[in-house]
């Protein structure tokens, strides 16, 4: 008599994130997507960040929750810092090496526990760039690994070319060298990711990103929050520099995540009640200028004043996000001039995805961070580009010169100038009225259609996700227990 065998356990993928909302959010979205395709996902970050997630998500540690065809759970490790030492947790120079020292040990222990105690061995590790040492852990344990790159493919190429000395970059003696990379437009010296420039004061950020570039050869997949048609030339070029298929565009990631029916992940941990949507409903179509500079970029109050008076002079209605400062940088909260306040709505937070998809929004004044860039492009919203540093200056080049969905207001903090109100008003008029505004909107709507096609069933991003899941050997599964069991893992490391 033949014994009845248990259904195979789905491949177990462990996602390890740097603690921080801008890092956790995209990786959680990826985890949700992978779970929906039939994988067992364990999302891991530090205990200090776990406390915040428990409050917002009401999650239970190590408890499996069904998502689509698979499962998602959370696990956390102690970062080894005193509970009240927030100063170290917000200082990258201190936190990064400490987290690597502690994290390597803790992640190895977690992998061991899942293998020996719950009989759910980890088949793949995925990290985001600020914890690139996860690739070393995977190599030590002989587990395949992948990375989620949360900037553009163009920025990935710039860092890759810089690290491997493939073309000339600005130096201390020649700071104004322009950079030409195959598959990309010529980048002026102030259009490359600014951390690469020798004059950048952010050398610690350059080092942490280069640490991931150094480890790319250890990964079998590089997920990128972009889509094929948006960056086709550079995606094709970068794919020739690595193993075939290693570059996997999965974007727009926030739109991909919406394709999953059952959402157990409240991505924004600080999300209050959204005060914006009812107000937007009361505004005419294409009448509101949305203004937000992200969670990290900080403008001087004098610049905020000039932007505010520029909005007033352009005679446009605005929705402006003025955030409470949460980063421990002792920055004062921005204040808008009294005479401006009656022209629009000021909020501390809003759901940017929902705002950008609202028909009342005419344009987006943005710092050009990649999340904001992707959300604007894939929502069909023209932009007024006010980049500051890092990848933002390169993202602005693409919106203005390549995709032709934006106009320029600044070249970044290296420009060292106060953009006057007259210039602000001129750019706002350009993007909201007249022939240029019509052309920008037409281009933006084209990219919105391309983004929707990419995430649709059978679209380029959907296919890239399916190929990865197939690579892991996912099979239809039965119920997975939270405790130990005798299931045999489907798939094999040898397939990688």
Swiss-Prot record:
EC nos: 2.4.1.120
Active-site residue list: 23 (proton acceptor)
Catalytic activity field: (E)-sinapate + UDP-alpha-D-glucose = 1-O-(trans-sinapoyl)-beta-D-glucose + UDP
Any one GO molecular-function label of the UniProt entry: sinapate 1-glucosyltransferase activity
Gene induction: Induced by the auxin indole-3-butyric acid (IBA).
Listed GO CC annotations: cytoplasm
Function of the protein: Sinapate glucosyltransferase (SGT) required for the biosynthesis of the glucose ester sinapoylglucose and subsequently sinapoylmalate and sinapoylcholine. Is the major SGT activity in plant. Plays an important role in sinapoylation of anthocyanins. Sinapoylglucose produced by UGT84A2 is a significant source of sinapoyl moieties for anthocyanins. Indole-3-butyric acid (IBA)-specific glucosyltransferase that catalyzes the glucosylation of the auxin IBA, but not indole-3-acetic acid (IAA).
Extra remark beyond the main annotation: Ectopic expression of UGT84A2 causes delay in flowering increase of indole-3-butyric acid (IBA) level, down-regulation of the auxin-response factors ARF6 and ARF8, and down-regulation of the flowering-related genes FT, SOC1, AP1, and LFY.
Protein name from the UniProt record: UDP-glycosyltransferase 84A2
Gene giving rise to this polypeptide: UGT84A2
């Amino acid at each position: 008599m033949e014994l009845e065998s248990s259904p195979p356990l789905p491949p177990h993928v462990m996602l390890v994130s740097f603690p921080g909302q801008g890092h956790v959010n995209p990786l959680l979205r990826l985890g949700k997507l992978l779970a929906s395709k039939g994988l067992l996902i364990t999302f891991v970050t530090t205990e200090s960040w776990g406390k915040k997630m428990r409050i917002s998500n009401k999650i239970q540690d190590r408890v499996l929750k069904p998502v689509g065809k698979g499962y998602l759970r959370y696990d956390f490790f102690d970062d080894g810092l005193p509970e009240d030492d927030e100063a170290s947790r917000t200082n990258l120079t201190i936190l990064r090496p400490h987290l690597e020292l502690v994290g390597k040990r803790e992640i190895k222990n977690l992998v061991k526990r899942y293998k020996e105690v719950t009989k759910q061995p980890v088949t793949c590790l995925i990290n985001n760039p600020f914890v690139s040492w996860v690739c070393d852990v995977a190599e030590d344990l002989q587990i395949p690994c992948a990375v989620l790159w949360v900037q553009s493919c163009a920025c990935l190429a710039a860092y890759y070319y810089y690290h491997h000395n493939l073309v000339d970059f600005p130096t201390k003696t020649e700071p104004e060298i322009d950079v030409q990379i195959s598959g990309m437009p010529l980048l002026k010296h102030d259009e490359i990711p600014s951390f690469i420039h020798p004059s950048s004061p952010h050398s610690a950020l350059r080092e942490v990103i280069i640490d991931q570039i150094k480890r790319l050869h250890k990964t079998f997949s590089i997920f990128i929050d972009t889509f094929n048609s948006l960056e086709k030339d550079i995606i094709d070029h970068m794919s020739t520099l690595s193993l075939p298929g290693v570059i996997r565009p999965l974007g727009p990631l926030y739109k991909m995540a919406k394709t999953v029916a059952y959402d157990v992940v409240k991505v924004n941990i600080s999300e209050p009640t959204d005060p914006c949507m009812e107000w937007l409903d009361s505004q005419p179509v294409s009448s509101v200028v949305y203004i937000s500079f992200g969670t990290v970029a900080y403008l001087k109050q004098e610049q905020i004043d000039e932007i505010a008076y520029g909005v007033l002079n352009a005679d446009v209605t605005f929705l402006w996000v003025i955030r409470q400062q949460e980063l421990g940088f002792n920055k004062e909260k921005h204040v808008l001039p009294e005479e401006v306040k009656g022209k629009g709505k000021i909020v501390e937070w809003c759901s940017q995805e929902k705002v950008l998809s609202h028909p009342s929004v005419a344009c987006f004044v943005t710092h050009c961070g990649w999340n904001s860039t992707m959300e604007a492009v894939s929502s069909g919203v023209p932009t007024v580009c006010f980049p500051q540093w890092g990848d933002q200056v390169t993202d602005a080049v693409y919106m203005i010169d390549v995709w032709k969905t934006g106009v320029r207001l600044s070249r970044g903090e290296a420009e060292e100038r106060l953009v006057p109100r007259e210039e602000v008003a001129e750019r706002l008029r350009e993007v909201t009225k007249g022939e240029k505004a019509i052309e920008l909107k037409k281009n933006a709507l084209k990219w919105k259609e391309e983004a929707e096609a990419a995430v649709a069933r059978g679209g380029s991003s959907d296919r890239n996700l399916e190929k990865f899941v197939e690579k892991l050997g996912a099979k239809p599964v039965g119920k997975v227990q939270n405790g130990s069991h005798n299931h045999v893992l489907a798939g094999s490391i040898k397939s990688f």
